[in-house]
Structures are given as C-alpha cells and as structure tokens.
C-alpha cells in the first residue's frame, strides 16, 4: 500500500493542510514509525539528491542524455512497467471501487524525509523558497502524484522528455539502493 498511501492520503493531506499535517494526523504508534523512517531516510535521500544536483549543475547529466540518445538505435529505451510491482499497480488502478488506505507512518516518514531533503538542498544552494515550494512540493502533490495515481508511473514517465525518462531509470535504482542499504 506504499504507492497508494503516497498518491492518495499523503498527497491530499499535504495539498490540503501542509507538510506538518501528515505527521499530526497519525496516531502515536504511526508517529513513532514516521520518526524512525524519517530519521533513517533523510541522509541517504539527501546524498542521492546532492549527486543528482551536482550531475545537473556540472553538465554531466546533459552529456549522459546525449550519449544515451546516441545508443538508442542499438539499445532503445523500454517501458518501465514490465516488473511485477508495476503490474500490481495496473490491477489496483483498474479497480474503480478502490478506497485509499490510511496514511502509513513508515511510508510517510520516508516520503517526507526525501521531500524535505530536496527542500533543504535547494535552500542550501540558494534557490528562492517560492520556487522550491512550487516545484518540489506543490507540483508533486497536486500534479504528479494524482496523475501517477490515475495513469501509473510508466505512463507519466514515458510521456515526459528524454531527459526525464532517462533520469527516472537512472536514479530510481540509486534511491532504492541507498534507502534499502543505508536506512534499513
């Protein structure tokens, strides 16, 4: 229920009532799970976000996209929804009577730690807070997550730019590794 928790009640709560409301709406046991997950996830997520930021700022990301594009004739970019995880999501979205699960404290902690790590990174790098709030928080909870909830991550990603499509594939594995190996 991780994806459902993020694209459903977590995003809706942030959109409606702000970031702190996610934590405040949890019961005591879920608050403990949130705190544990948040503290365990913040620095591993921040490490990846720093790497992404540096890759973009240095021009390495652009070079990587150009190089990957040059390989497309031999190694075309495939769809990202071919694994069991994505197939389950397709079945869940097909159920029109589905109800959103309640906020999962652990999921919320990891998600919020990653979001706040991004906010802190962009603040540290001198971005104006209005830009950070709009492009890191509002766009996620009011645009990307609802769209992903409706159509799935593959549809959302694979209808983006080549840069976004490659980035999703490149960085997802790094997030997965860091969060699994360093957080838990």
Predicted feature locations:
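NAD(P)-dependent Rossmann-like dehydrogenase/reductase catalytic/cofactor-binding core
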Residues: 6-99, 106-184
């Amino acid at each position: 229920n991780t994806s459902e928790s993020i694209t459903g009640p977590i995003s809706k709560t942030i959109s409606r009532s702000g970031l702190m409301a996610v934590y405040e709406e949890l019961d005591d046991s879920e608050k403990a799970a949130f705190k544990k997950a948040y503290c365990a996830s913040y620095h591993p997520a921040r490490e990846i976000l720093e790497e992404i930021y540096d890759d973009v700022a240095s021009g390495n990301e652009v070079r990587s996209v150009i190089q990957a594009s040059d390989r497309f004739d031999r190694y075309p970019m495939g769809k990202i929804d071919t694994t069991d995880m994505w197939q389950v999501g397709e079945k869940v979205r097909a159920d029109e009577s589905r109800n959103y699960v309640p906020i999962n404290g652990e999921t919320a902690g990891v998600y919020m730690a990653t979001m706040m790590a991004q906010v802190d990174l962009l603040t540290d790098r001198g971005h104006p807070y209005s830009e950070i709030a709009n492009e890191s928080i509002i766009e996620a909870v009011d645009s990307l997550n609802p769209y992903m909830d409706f159509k799935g991550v593959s549809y959302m990603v694979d209808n983006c730019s080549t840069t976004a499509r490659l980035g999703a594939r490149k960085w997802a594995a790094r997030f997965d590794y860091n969060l699994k190996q360093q957080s838990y």
